[in-house]
Amino acid sequence: MSNIGRNVSGDLKEKLISVNRVSKTVKGGRIFSFSALTVVGDGHGKVGFGYGKAREVPSAIQKAMEKARRNMIQVPLNNGTLQYSVTGSYTGSYIFMKPASNGTGIIAGGAMRSVLEVAGVHNVLAKTYGSTNPINVVRATMLVLESMKSPEMIALKRNKLVKEILENSYL
């Protein structure tokens, strides 16, 4: 599993999480193709992931990056960390993420770490349970980040003041 990161124009950070070679057996032999999993983010709460497949590695990476740019979401951050503790799952991967104090860093493994880095999360404690398949872990992480709400959004939904929400919760 490789983790190649680079900055591109428009202040987007791109990270290649994994490249897999897959083969299809036909009458004449095997046909090899490649799949790439990438994440893209601006470092300020916007993040997206993409999965691309092609006959050659560069084409697969390019397709994955393009899909990642098209599927970006906004994550409500709180001073470089999460708003509150969250859990989530996708197929066999279960994840737990918890906000951390300043200076902690990103305590997360593998694919989840890449997603959090490009999203702009600087302090978080995270753990993956079950399957550590990079695709499932990235999807679970994205689902959890997408479901997070800021205190302002919660207050608006409940017709309350932000102050009331923050007083009565662990946000």
UniProtKB/Swiss-Prot annotation:
One of its GO terms (biological process) is translation. The keyword Protease does not apply. InterPro entries: Ribosomal_Su5_D2-typ_SF (IPR020568), Ribosomal_uS5 (IPR000851), Ribosomal_uS5_bac-type (IPR005712), Ribosomal_uS5_C (IPR005324), Ribosomal_uS5_N (IPR013810), Ribosomal_uS5_N_CS (IPR018192), Ribsml_uS5_D2-typ_fold_subgr (IPR014721). Gene3D superfamilies: 3.30.160.20, 3.30.230.10. One of its GO terms (molecular function) is rRNA binding. With S4 and S12 plays an important role in translational accuracy. Located at the back of the 30S subunit body where it stabilizes the conformation of the head with respect to the body. Belongs to the universal ribosomal protein uS5 family. Part of the 30S ribosomal subunit. Contacts proteins S4 and S8. PANTHER family: MITOCHONDRIAL RIBOSOMAL PROTEIN S5 (PTHR48277:SF1). This is Small ribosomal subunit protein uS5. It comes from Buchnera aphidicola subsp. Baizongia pistaciae (strain Bp). The gene is rpsE.
